[in-house]
Swiss-Prot record:
Binding site for substrate: R65, Y207, K213, R333
Species for this entry: Shigella flexneri serotype 5b (strain 8401)
Designated name of the protein: Phosphoenolpyruvate carboxykinase (ATP)
Gene: pckA
Keyword DNA repair in annotation: no
Gene Ontology terms: cellular component: cytosol
MF-aspect GO terms: ATP binding; metal ion binding; phosphoenolpyruvate carboxykinase (ATP) activity
Cofactor(s) needed: Mn(2+)
Amino acid sequence: MRVNNGLTPQELEAYGISDVHDIVYNPSYDLLYQEELDPSLTGYERGVLTNLGAVAVDTGIFTGRSPKDKYIVRDDTTRDTFWWADKGKGKNDNKPLSPETWQHLKGLVTRQLSGKRLFVVDAFCGANPDTRLSVRFITEVAWQAHFVKNMFIRPSDEELAGFKPDFIVMNGAKCTNPQWKEQGLNSENFVAFNLTERMQLIGGTWYGGEMKKGMFSMMNYLLPLKGIASMHCSANVGEKGDVAVFFGLSGTGKTTLSTDPKRRLIGDDEHGWDDDGVFNFEGGCYAKTIKLSKEAEPEIYNAIRRDALLENVTVREDGTIDFDDGSKTENTRVSYPIYHIDNIVKPVSKAGHATKVIFLTADAFGVLPPVSRLTADQTQYHFLSGFTAKLAGTERGITEPTPTFSACFGAAFLSLHPTQYAEVLVKRMQAAGAQAYLVNTGWNGTGKRISIKDTRAIIDAILNGSLDNAETFTLPMFNLAIPTELPGVDTKILDPRNTYASPEQWQEKAETLAKLFIDNFDKYTDTPAGTALVAAGPKL
């Protein structure tokens, strides 16, 4: 057992955690495996062994993030830089918290962790040493330590010896805030951040993704202020060093489409883009497993083995997993260290500048084409719009596809105004000569989802350049350039109008969607730059 390794109870006292006699510091995977399966554990702490060798855990009622319970301390550090929920036209989850309420929440979490046996994991967020965050995670739950060990970048022994945390994450999942009503908060649960103290507090929710996305929100604050793009995207690189990034909200295909046997994976969800190129923030992947099959997604299926951690899946008595069962949540997940995928960039998850930028959308209306090539203005317009259908279960209370607009394909994680991310991305794209594409992985007039097979063929055509050489026609109303044919893709589906019984049916739905786009983009028209982009959007 790697206990302490120089980490003392006195260091934890500096954070307000007292009477800690047993610190399990940066535990090995073997130790975590034993701890998670300890028969004396009860409730959500206890894991179950599956036939694939991975441990499965349940996260209770919190099977997704709780954006309504997210708060940021408003003080001199953040007052003039953060994109606040209570200011401006755009809606977001960055609700302000007073320093006094923060102290109260911190007291709740530190009391919860005091006197306990604690797991402490030191890890990096960001593959570039110049801009990475050194993060210390503190929890009393073994599988939560396992989750962050999977998802963040694991330091070498030398790096651990000199590790000085830039950020502290204290996970008090077992405690709640009984005074939430008097404090004007959303509920007894909380996910709170303090940029002055460089700390995140979690209370009431067991969902592991709060730690992952919490640090993403912090990178989204720190990097763009240095001129570095911070992106909710997956990324991979071809044999010739050509880099592609895939933007998209949860469930649109970021992980599936970037995990490609012909290309090496840089990462599946969070990246930066600086003067050297594209780099991963993470050391693992967090894949959706609902309806997972070995045939359709062999790389992800084969990554589910010892050291992977499954969340909220149904495990039968014999240890087999029913991946089709979404009764707990549609947002069933697995986290695994990135090296569980064979074809990855080594030893560091980074590569050169991106030349292909792909916006993934899952259009529940069945209006948008499976692929279109964007102009420079359309690139900014669709990046700021961030349209998709919210897919079942990534957030609590959402089970059917509903249309949503999420700025920069990740509004929930943005800490600055969306236009700041668009400006940085455009600068990086222009310098690299990158081209953007809009790819619909959602539905069409048949009422069925566009097949993974067709989407993969579309991605191949983008990456090998054949789409850029294809003849195109323009889809009315949305003004999108669509190829007339692509190798390996059913030509009938390229024009979405052809998938309907009559063109009028498409027209009717298209008008509905166009109006939603126009109404949503109104929030950007309070600046001249935003107003200038309106022409790149749909026209009624």
